[in-house]
Amino acid sequence: MKAVVFAYHDMGCTGIQALLDAGYDIAAIFTHPDNPGENHFFGSVARLAAEQGIPVWAPEDVNHPLWIERIREMKPDVLFSFYYRNLLGDEILNLAPKGAFNLHGSLLPKYRGRAPLNWVLVNGESETGVTLHRMVNRADAGDIVAQQAVAIGADDAALTLHRKLCAAATELLSRALPAILAGTTDERPQDHSQATYVGRRTPEDGRLDWELPAQTLHNLVRAVSDPWPGAFGYAGANKFIVWKSRVRHDLPAAKPGTVLSIAPLIVACQDGALEIVTGQTERGVYMQGAQLAQALGLVSGAVISSKPVVAIKRRTRVLILGVNGFIGNHLTERLLQDDNYEIYGLDIGSDAISRFLDCPRFHFVEGDISIHSEWIEYHIKKCDVVLPLVAIATPIEYTRNPLRVFELDFEENLKIIRDCVKYNKRIIFPSTSEVYGMCTDKNFDEDSSNLVVGPINKQRWIYSVSKQLLDRVIWAYGDKNGLKFTLFRPFNWMGPRLDNLNAARIGSSRAITQLILNLVEGSPIKLIEGGKQKRCFTDISDGIEALFRIIENKDGRCDGQIINIGNPDNEASIKELAEMLLACFERHPLRDRFPPFAGFREVESSDYYGKGYQDVEHRKPSIRNAKRCLNWEPKVEMEETVEHTLDFFLRTVELVDDKNP
């Protein structure tokens, strides 16, 4: 009978060997690549397959149509799963006419799910076992083919029980596999009303809570002892691991966590006490309990905890490249309002951040990211969070200097991304609403909207595509290399210090700054294609608060996320923005210092931006991810933002005029 096998771990090796011994023809084996973060004490399915001359694969998604088709071509009679970590879809299960069978490490229907071996010890069970059952589209719910019970001894820990289960699996399979081969199995349905479910365990689940009974903690120690990560506690700020313990009821009661003795090392619990027979400090070696007490500096009467009691707080170091820019200087101001952050910044100028230069938590170097690569790499290594905010982000430059846009926005930022991967640093990358391009969705969604750009001869898309490709590179590094990242997409942020009027004079600024320059100089406001394009304008204070919460990253909710940051309620056309700005200008107290309004003038985009430009009719964000990950919503109405922005620039002009009469 031809079999295709899905297997991992010692149980995988046990199952494969049993199939070979029973005379099955194994056409292929599917397994998992070893995780470098795991302690690989178990046998290698891949190595066993290679030694037996059996083809072996470890696909990321075995349920992908390409792999389904490959398995179909193998024409298996039967499928077996031995501790394979992923569920097999119906399309695979239906490929084998004799059915699909799974080996599970408990006496089903009890302990369906992940890590039953550890859970039975945690719960103090006296019996467990292994079950061979038919696979259905619900995990561990199919008819039972055979079971083998295993007694759990009082001295059993995770490894000894694991070995017992492997031996039981060998015995069970020696009976069941020939029956499957002969078609003589005696199967029975599970009683689903008796089913219990357990979930995946993590190292954090090994935390010792001294408020619990000593027997409960002893069971936990047994369940996660070596080669699993171990049960742990804290003496002050020092973490220690308990590998072996015993319950003591012969000492007087005391406050939970109190050290009752150091030789042997005994700690009071809610009910009884726990003797730590062997353990180790976090970076130490395996040792007896009395030596562990000495290494931790414990004395009788000391109190230990489940969490670090004394933790030296270090500020989060944030590296901001482009710190003098619009987002950079406002973000610096917000971070310095919180004592938890220390900022390292680099930019080619310092006019916008001069107000922070005397702050001891702000460290600034004037420089160019294309020149100061060694400084940047050193500070990426030194800091905790990296925000590469340097980019050319003004539309006229996309057609005027497309290669410079590519060199700075893509090539220089790619170096920074790779350094973050190299030093395992979290990157918060400024994507852009431009990546959505000419998307036709009513609201642009980070996870489902298509990213639509124009033809190659429309060079204005070089910015959008450069940013999109970096988004994809970062995503791939996160998926394949474990890079911690968040991508944020600003939607038309406005406020004080957005560009400057000198940049607007040469056309290298965002829309509102250009419009303010027209009012200040008394020149006509140019409306590209009539100013019908709609945007959603976001106050810089709202945007920065969202970005601050991304940096905070409470409970890791922003890891691996793409987050639009915009105000969908502040949607307006460029013409409506200009009219609102004009109304604010006319009632401003400094209005009489400036020339009369010169009117609106409609111009074609090719006349203003040059050939290669293509505009976008609307750009409205979905902020579902921002609400979910950040508990954030924008608050500032558009007119208030326009007033503040205009006031800042008009008073800047006033200061210049006062100095230069």
Curated annotation (Swiss-Prot):
Transmembrane segments: none annotated. It catalyses: UDP-alpha-D-glucuronate + NAD(+) = UDP-beta-L-threo-pentopyranos-4-ulose + CO2 + NADH; UDP-4-amino-4-deoxy-beta-L-arabinose + (6R)-10-formyltetrahydrofolate = UDP-4-deoxy-4-formamido-beta-L-arabinose + (6S)-5,6,7,8-tetrahydrofolate + H(+). GO terms for cellular component: membrane. Keywords: Antibiotic resistance, Lipid A biosynthesis, Lipid biosynthesis, Lipid metabolism, Lipopolysaccharide biosynthesis, Multifunctional enzyme, NAD, Oxidoreductase, Transferase. The active site is at H104, E434, R619. NAD(+) binds at D347, D368, I369. Homohexamer, formed by a dimer of trimers. This is Bifunctional polymyxin resistance protein ArnA. It comes from Klebsiella pneumoniae subsp. pneumoniae (strain ATCC 700721 / MGH 78578).
